[in-house]
Amino acid sequence: MIQFQRLHKSYTVDGRQIVALHPLDLRIGPGEVFGIIGHSGAGKSTLIRLINRLEEPTGGRLLIGDEDVTALNSTGLRALRRRVGMIFQHFNLLSSRTVAGNVAFPLELAGTPRAEIDARVAELLARVGLEQHATKYPAQLSGGQKQRVGIARALATRPQILLCDEATSALDPQTTASVLQLLAQINRELGLTIVLITHEMEVIRRVCDRVAVLDAGKLVETGPVTEVFLHPQHPTTRRFVSEAEHVDEAELHRDFEAVGGRIVRLTFLGNGTYEPVLGRIARETGVDYNILSGRVDRIKDTPYGQLTVALTGGDQNAARAGFVAAGVHVEDLRV
């Protein structure tokens, strides 16, 4: 368990105090993949770097388990950083070392015996799919391969927590998907707590269990990804979701002017995504429907579907009640 208790961070620049992170309270459970999303300058990098004290907090407390990280001395901090691995946007590999040498580096610093280092490096390179590249140098690798080296290096000391600081933002979409798949696999197989920061809701949707949304250094929304993604409350969150779904809400509402009737957005979650609920309720209530937009996708391992439909004729109130009774979330866009 990672607990932020009124944790905050400020800087003094030219005699002025700049607040990077306002006091916040947050809990991250053991074994979770927890996402932190925000635009540039929102405070997300500051937040994640407070966990291993690459940034020093101005005030508040940070607990990992029962240990107060904010109270650790230098010896305790070194021990903490062996339990908290980190990967970075720009990989931060040592160009003069081979792939194997980069992965071995934290073990060498810890004074691990050579035979144990060699065995651990071989195990980790196999886990990230780079066993054939052990003797190559970073300059000979693709971006995705470099990030896999970074992941292997971060896992070398068998950490309990893995911090991912914009780990996929420098990668193309296909490589991003493969790295996210690897992180999800590591979470399942090793039970690691993963804290991931990003400015892309699509990354959150693919791998995270819960998410926190930051805006101008403030925590504005948090909850399970299914809830936050499908029913965003804060304007910042709604913008992230619209960008991820490539939906222009203003354009969509202009399209509404071309159709009559009551317009609703129906959200299906889990196995109900594949049930013929719309057709059944239309028959039962006598309503006609016009599908204006729709999609079926997944949030991590959970299928979901969304339909925007115009309802005409029949008993529309009964149809709405029928959708709710079937476990469908109904949002009235025009009554």
Curated annotation (Swiss-Prot):
Broad EC category: translocase
A GO-annotated cellular component: plasma membrane
Residue ranges annotated for the ABC transporter domain, each copy included: 2-241
Molecular functions per Gene Ontology: ABC-type D-methionine transporter activity; ATP binding; ATP hydrolysis activity
Subcellular location: Cell inner membrane
PROSITE patterns (alphabetical): ABC_TRANSPORTER_1, ABC_TRANSPORTER_2, METN
Pfam families per record: ABC_tran (PF00005), NIL (PF09383)
Primary location recorded for the protein, binned into one broad class: membrane
Keyword Iron-sulfur set for record: no
UniProt membrane topology term: Peripheral membrane protein
Gene3D superfamilies referenced in this protein's UniProt entry, alphabetically: 3.30.70.260, P-loop containing nucleotide triphosphate hydrolases
Positions bound to ATP: 38-45
EC numbers: 7.4.2.11
Keyword Membrane: yes
Alphabetized UniProt keyword annotations: Amino-acid transport, ATP-binding, Cell inner membrane, Cell membrane, Membrane, Nucleotide-binding, Translocase, Transport
Catalytic activity annotation: L-methionine(out) + ATP + H2O = L-methionine(in) + ADP + phosphate + H(+); D-methionine(out) + ATP + H2O = D-methionine(in) + ADP + phosphate + H(+)
Function: Part of the ABC transporter complex MetNIQ involved in methionine import. Responsible for energy coupling to the transport system.
Family: Belongs to the ABC transporter superfamily. Methionine importer (TC 3.A.1.24) family.
Subunit structure, as described in the record: The complex is composed of two ATP-binding proteins (MetN), two transmembrane proteins (MetI) and a solute-binding protein (MetQ).
Name under which the protein is recorded: Methionine import ATP-binding protein MetN
Higher taxonomy: Bacteria, Pseudomonadati, Pseudomonadota, Gammaproteobacteria, Lysobacterales
Gene designation: metN
